[in-house]
């Protein structure tokens, strides 16, 4: 019997050393501490109304996500009599599609952007549409991960292996985004957040 008690004691000590009986820190913490770990990105506070939609694209597709956002608002108002104040429209771009959020200065500095977007030129052809959507309260979101990797997509091929060139390009992207565009950490999480808050998902990637 003594041997059995000694064995159980040693087993319990081993379990404690390995943390087998421990409770995860976040589960055992007070509710107030756990809630402090949860936060929304700033754009979430702008959601309004009962008609909510998120248009998503990772490919240029001639700015389809932007154009569909405009069509959604126009049709809701003119055909169904829905006021824009009762609509929340989110456009989330990642991958190559974030080029539509780049300012004209960056397009002029890097003609390779237009080539990647399928519209060679030194200015962003979607700039006026982006400005119009901003004025109508559309939430425009650019993926931070995609911005960080943007040099690998938009720089001339000869520069894409240059880490310093890629970093400089990403910094320039952030500095020259069109007014009204917000950067989110990760588009895949943003899409989940939007759908959790009642936004219907529409893929506009081609």
Question: What would you call each of these model-derived segments?
Answer:
Residues 21-51:
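C-terminal segment of N-terminal export signals and the immediately downstream linker at the start
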Residues 1-15:
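N-terminal secretory signal peptides and thylakoid transit peptides that target proteins
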Residues 117-206:
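A cross-taxonomic marker for long C-terminal extensions/tails that follow the last structured domain
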Residues 76-90, 142-145, 205:
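Surface-exposed patches in mature extracellular/periplasmic domains of secreted proteins
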Residues 105-122:
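A charged helix-plus-loop insertion that forms the helical arch/lid used to bind
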Residues 52-59, 89-94:
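Short glycine-rich or small-residue beta-strand-to-loop segments that form or flank ligand, phosphate
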Residues 63-82:
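Histidine-anchored nucleotide/phosphate-binding helix
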Residues 82-106:
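Acidic helix-start/capping segments at beta-turn-to-alpha-helix junctions
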């Amino acid at each position: 019997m003594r041997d059995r008690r000694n064995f159980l004691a040693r087993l319990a000590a081993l379990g404690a050393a390995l943390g087998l009986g421990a409770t995860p820190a976040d589960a055992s913490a007070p509710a107030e501490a756990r809630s402090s770990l949860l936060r929304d990105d700033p754009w979430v506070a702008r959601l309004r109304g009962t008609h909510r939609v998120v248009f998503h694209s990772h490919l240029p597709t001639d700015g389809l996500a932007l154009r569909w956002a405009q069509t959604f608002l126009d049709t809701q108002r003119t055909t169904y009599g829905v006021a824009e104040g009762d609509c929340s429209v989110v456009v989330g771009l990642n991958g190559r599609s974030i080029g539509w959020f780049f300012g004209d200065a960056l397009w002029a500095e890097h003609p390779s952007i237009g080539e990647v977007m399928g519209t060679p030129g030194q200015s962003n052809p979607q700039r006026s549409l982006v400005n119009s959507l901003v004025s109508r309260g559309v939430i425009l979101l650019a993926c931070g991960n995609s911005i960080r990797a943007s040099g690998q997509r938009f720089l001339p091929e000869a520069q894409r292996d240059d880490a310093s060139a890629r970093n400089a390009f990403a910094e320039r992207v952030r500095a020259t985004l069109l007014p009204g565009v917000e950067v989110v950490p990760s588009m895949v999480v943003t899409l989940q957040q939007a759908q959790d808050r009642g936004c219907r998902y529409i893929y506009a990637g081609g």
